[in-house]
Amino acid sequence: MTDSFDDGLEGAHLDTLAIRAGIVRTAEGEHAEPIFATSSYVFANAAEAAARFGGEQDGNVYSRYTNPTVRTFEQRIAALEGGEAAVGTS
């Protein structure tokens, strides 16, 4: 279960967006965004893995593609730029 703190940020100052945009809290109740350093994820079965890698099911597959830490970064940049979405690359 996650709660997005993006609600209510419409019209927020850039400083607030830089700190608060894209934050999603997990069921763990962390105070700050966790850093997901994992490189891969566990799947319940091969069918679930195939659906995720095929883009048929939402969820993480491999950190080089996306992970919650990168998603928070992308959402924060999109909010700062006033865009719908952003893509983080290196």
Q: Across the structure, where does each feature detected by a protein language model lie?
A:
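N-terminal glycine-rich, Lys/His-bearing helix-loop that initiates the first secondary-structure elements
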Residues: 1-60
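Conserved N-terminal alpha-helix of the aminotransferase class I/II PLP-enzyme fold
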Residues: 47-90
